[in-house]
C-alpha cells in the first residue's frame, strides 16, 4: 500500500475522489490484517472512527473543511481521549477510560481528523524498544524479529506499515526520534512548550513534548500546524504567534551552515550508520550547504544526567497512581498502606518500578544535593554548549541512534545498554531544543537508518526545510517494507 502524503489525501477528499469514511475503512482493514503481527495498536474502535469520518465528510460537503479534514490519524496511548481507553501501556491504567480530551486530541478533532485508534507504547513512556508495554511488544515492520524503538514504537510501526498516514507521539529522551529512525519514518520533537502537555500522561514534566510522526517532513509540517498553539491549561505552554510550518519547505539550502558535533561521531557509532550519515551530509552539500565542526562537550554526560532527572520527576508524577481514585487496585489488602504497596507492586512493570526507585533515591535526604542538584547544573551546561554551537551553525546534524533496530529481547536484561540507544537524542530534551529524525538509508540487514537534525529554539520551520529538501533528492522516506506492501 503506497503512502500518499497528507496533502494528497486531503486533495482526494476535497475532490470527492474518496470519502473520509472510505479512507478510514481502508486503514481499518489494513489494521485488522496487520495488527495481529505488528501489535502497533492497543485500542481500535471502528464504530467511533467511522462516526468521526462521517462528521468529517459532512464538513467537506458543507464547504467547511480545513487543510486536513477527513484525513485519519493514530494517537499514542498516552493522550487522554474522551470515551476511549487510555492505558499508557500499563496494567495500572488497563481499564481507564479518559473523561476528557488532551489538547493534542482536541486540536486533531477540531481539524476534522478521525482517530484510527490508540497506539502501543512502552509503559508510561519508559523504554527504548516498546518491550515494556503491558499489552505486549511491538514488532518492527521491516523485520518482525526486531524492535521498533520506543517509547512511541506503536506510532512509528503503524506509520511504517501504512496502517495510518500519520500519528502523534511524545518525546522525553528520544521517544519520537529513535523509533522513527528504527522504523524508517520521519518524526519531530518540537521546542519544549510549543505543544501543550494538557491531558498527556506525565513521565518527566520538564522534558515531555508531543510531536508528529509521518512518512515525510512535509507531512510532519502539516501536522505540526494542527497541534501547536498556546494552551492556558498547560503552565509551560508558550504564547507565540501561530506559524505555518510549511512556509519555508521549498527554500533553497544555499548558505546553510550544518554543525557536525565530534561527540556524535565518536566510538560506539555503528559503521553502517556513520556511512549513511556521511552520505546524507554529502547530499546536503550538493544542495548548497556547508559543514562546520562543532563540539558539544557536555553531551557525553547527557545519559547520567537524564537518568537522575527523569526518574526524579517520574517518582513524583507516578505517585498519583495509588489505587484510590482511578486505575488498578490490588484485589486483596490488609489496610490502606498495604493497598498502596500491593497496588503499585502489581500495577507497575519492572522498568517503571526501577525508575521510580532511582528517582526516589536521588530525591532523598542526603542525596538530593549530590545527585539531583548536580544534574540540574550539568543540564544548564549542556544547554550552554548548544547555544555556543548555534553561533556558528544553523542546524546540527548527526545520527539519531548509535545503531539500527536490535532483536527482540536482546537488551532486555541490560538496562544500561538499552539506555545508550538515546545517547544522541537526550541532549536536545535536556536543552528543550527541537529535534527530528528522518530516514537516510538501510544497513546490510535491510533495517532503516535515521539521521537527526537539532535546531535552535523555535527553528522547526528551518529544520523542516532542510529535511524536505533532502527528501526531494532521496527516496528513503518513500520506501516501505516489501513484506507488507
UniProtKB/Swiss-Prot annotation:
EC class of the enzyme, as a word: ligase
GO BP of this protein: translation
E.C. code: 6.3.5.7
InterPro entries: Amidase, Amidase_CS, Amidase_dom, AS_sf, GatA
List of catalytic residues: 76 (charge relay system), 151 (charge relay system), 175 (acyl-ester intermediate)
Any one cellular-component term (Gene Ontology): glutamyl-tRNA(Gln) amidotransferase complex
GO molecular-function terms, A-Z: ATP binding; glutaminyl-tRNA synthase (glutamine-hydrolyzing) activity
PANTHER family listed in its UniProt record: GLUTAMYL-TRNA(GLN) AMIDOTRANSFERASE SUBUNIT A, TRANSAMIDASE
Binding partners and assembly: Heterotrimer of A, B and C subunits.
UniProt protein name: Glutamyl-tRNA(Gln) amidotransferase subunit A
Source organism phylogeny: Bacteria, Pseudomonadati, Pseudomonadota, Betaproteobacteria, Nitrosomonadales
Amino acid at each position: 500500500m503506497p503512502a500518499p502524503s497528507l496533502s494528497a489525501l486531503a486533495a482526494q477528499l476535497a475532490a470527492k475522489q474518496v470519502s473520509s469514511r472510505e479512507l478510514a475503512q481502508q486503514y481499518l482493514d489494513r489494521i485488522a490484517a496487520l495488527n495481529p503481527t505488528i501489535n502497533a495498536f492497543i485500542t481500535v474502535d471502528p464504530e467511533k472512527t467511522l462516526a468521526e469520518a462521517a462528521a468529517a465528510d459532512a464538513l467537506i460537503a458543507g464547504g467547511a473543511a480545513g487543510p486536513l479534514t477527513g484525513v485519519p490519524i493514530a494517537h499514542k496511548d498516552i493522550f487522554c481521549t474522551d470515551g476511549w481507553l487510555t492505558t499508557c501501556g500499563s496494567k495500572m491504567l488497563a481499564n481507564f477510560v479518559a473523561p476528557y480530551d488532551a489538547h493534542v486530541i482536541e486540536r486533531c478533532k477540531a481539524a476534522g481528523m478521525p482517530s484510527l485508534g490508540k497506539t502501543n507504547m512502552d509503559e508510561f513512556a519508559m523504554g527504548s524498544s516498546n518491550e515494556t508495554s503491558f499489552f505486549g511488544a511491538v514488532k518492527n515492520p521491516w523485520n518482525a524479529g526486531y524492535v521498533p524503538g520506543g517509547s512511541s514504537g506503536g506510532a512509528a510501526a503503524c506509520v511504517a506499515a501504512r496502517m495510518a498516514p500519520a500519528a502523534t507521539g511524545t518525546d522525553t529522551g528520544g521517544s519520537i526520534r529513535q523509533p522513527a529512525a528504527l522504523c524508517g519514518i520521519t518524526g519531530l520533537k518540537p521546542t519544549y512548550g510549543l505543544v501543550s502537555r494538557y491531558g498527556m500522561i506525565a513521565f518527566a514534566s520538564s522534558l515531555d513534548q508531543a510531536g508528529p510522526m509521518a512518512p515525510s517532513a512535509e507531512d510532519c509540517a502539516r501536522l505540526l500546524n494542527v497541534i501547536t498553539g498556546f494552551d492556558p491549561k498547560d503552565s509551560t505552554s508558550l504564547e507565540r504567534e501561530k506559524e505555518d510550518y510549511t512556509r519555508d519547505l521549498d527554500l533553497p539550502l544555499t548558505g546553510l551552515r550544518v554543525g557536525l558535533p565530534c561527540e556524535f561521531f565518536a566510538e560506539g557509532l555503528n559503521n553502517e550508520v556513520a556511512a549513511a550519515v556521511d552520505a546524507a551530509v554529502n547530499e546536503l552539500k550538493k544542495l548548497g550547504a556547508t559543514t562546520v565542526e562543532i563540539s558539544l562537550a557536555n553531551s557525553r554526560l547527557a545519559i547520567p544526567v537524564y537518568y537522575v532527572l527523569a526518574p526524579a520527576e517520574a517518582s513524583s508524577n507516578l505517585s498519583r497512581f495509588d489505587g484510590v481514585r482511578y486505575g488498578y487496585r490490588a484485589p486483596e489488602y490488609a489496610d490502606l498502606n498495604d493497598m498502596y504497596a500491593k497496588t503499585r507492586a502489581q500495577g507497575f512493570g519492572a522498568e517503571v518500578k526501577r525508575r521510580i526507585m532511582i528517582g526516589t533515591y536521588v530525591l532523598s535526604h542526603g542525596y538530593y544535593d549530590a545527585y539531583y542538584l548536580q544534574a540540574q547544573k550539568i543540564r544548564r551546561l549542556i544547554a550552554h554548549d548548544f547555544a555556543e554551537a548555534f553561533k556558528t551553525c544553523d542546524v546540527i546534524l548527526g545520527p539519531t541512534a548509535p545503531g539500527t533496530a536490535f532483536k527482540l529481547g536482546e537488551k532486555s536484561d541490560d538496562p544500561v545498554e538499552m539506555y545508550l540507544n538515546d545517547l544522541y537524542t537526550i541532549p536536545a530534551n535536556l536543552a528543550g531544543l527541537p529535534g527530528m529524525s528522518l530516514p537516510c538509508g538501510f544497513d546490510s540487514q535491510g533495517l532503516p537508518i535515521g539521521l537527526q537534525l537539532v535546531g535552535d529554539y523555535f527553528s522547526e520551520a528551518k529544520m523542516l526545510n532542510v529535511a524536505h529538501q533532502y527528501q526531494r533528492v532521496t527516496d528513503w522516506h518513500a520506501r516501505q517494507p516489501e513484506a507488507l506492501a
